[in-house]
Amino acid sequence: MPSTASDPSVPAAARVLRRHRETADTWTLELKMANDSPAPPFAPGQFNMLYLFGVGESAISLSGDPARSDRLVHTVRAVGPVSRGISALSRGAAVGVRGPFGTAWPLEHAAGADVVIVAGGLGLAPLRPALYRLLATRRRYGRVVLLYGTRSPSDVLFQRELEQWRHSGEIDVRITVDHALETWRGHVGVV
């Protein structure tokens, strides 16, 4: 897939449209390309290089719906200087984008079969576009099962969305945590 700029080594300008806290150290940012240009198309499994001016850049998986061309969505855990800086960006702040890069998952090869997706912690973020694609083309597949594990209930990403998917019946969503409080009513154990 083509880069966001004519020269893939040069970041294209984008602005933070929305910032949402997922967990204590993880944020989801929605980015809009400068000059209201469409976001570059991407496929499930790809990533962008996000550039924080004056700090550096980091490879961050795309975590949004690949069918939406109006924005890019990235889920970032604040662990180093670049990811901490990107996570702290407020609405309207500038960020550079290069990409998308990487090989897409060949979901079309699973047509007619059951699909099981297994993720742990932040690993759900790069799999989320695949889940969006599977939902958009749901009739092409057998059962779709998501097995997702985190350290604790407070580490579950996209909680509202996972509940919506679970209640829709379109995806069999199973969540397990390593350590649970007495109030946790789900599975306990590792994925």
Regions of interest found by a model, annotated:
Residues 2-93, 150-152, 176-179:
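Ferredoxin-reductase
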Residues 81-191:
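FNR/FR-type flavoprotein reductase catalytic core
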